A protein has these predicted regions:
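Vicinal oxygen chelate
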Residues: 1, 7, 12-16, 32-33, 40-43, 47-49, 65-92, ...
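N-terminal beta-strand motif that seeds the catalytic metal site of vicinal oxygen chelate
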Residues: 1-19, 25, 69-71
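Small-side-chain structural scaffolding
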Residues: 8, 18, 42, 54-56, ...
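A generic short-segment signal for beta-strand/edge and adjacent turn/coil regions
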Residues: 10-14, 23-24, 37-44, 61-62, ...
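Structural motif
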Residues: 24-25, 88
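Conserved short beta-strand elements that form part of the metal-binding/catalytic scaffold
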Residues: 28-66
Length: 92
């Protein structure tokens, strides 16, 4: 049986700012809805990835922002990825 990771929750303090950041570095904004009062769910996916990240408000996530620091991103060209991040204004 194949097991695949499809969604990783990332705690953030500012949902709009986080969404803008991920869009700026090239992620697709797949979903941004408030299914109920006090809840907002945002799903972002890097181009070519089968795994997305999710964040929002009212989701019951208990991790403090900044503690999710072990996500591994695989790219075919690290130098090109680094250049893309720098061009998007990310400090490396």
């Amino acid at each position: 049986m194949d097991w695949k990771i499809e969604l990783i929750f990332v705690p953030v303090t500012d949902v709009d700012r986080a969404k803008e950041f991920y869009v700026r570095i090239g992620f697709n904004a797949d979903y941004d809805q408030s299914p109920s009062e006090g809840m907002r769910f945002v799903q972002m996916t890097p181009p070519g990835s089968a795994c997305s990240i999710a964040f929002g408000t009212g989701l019951g996530i208990t991790l403090a922002p900044g503690l999710q620091n072990t996500i591994q991103v695989v790219v075919p060209d690290a130098d090109a990825a680094h250049a893309q991040l720098l061009a998007a204004g990310v400090k490396a």
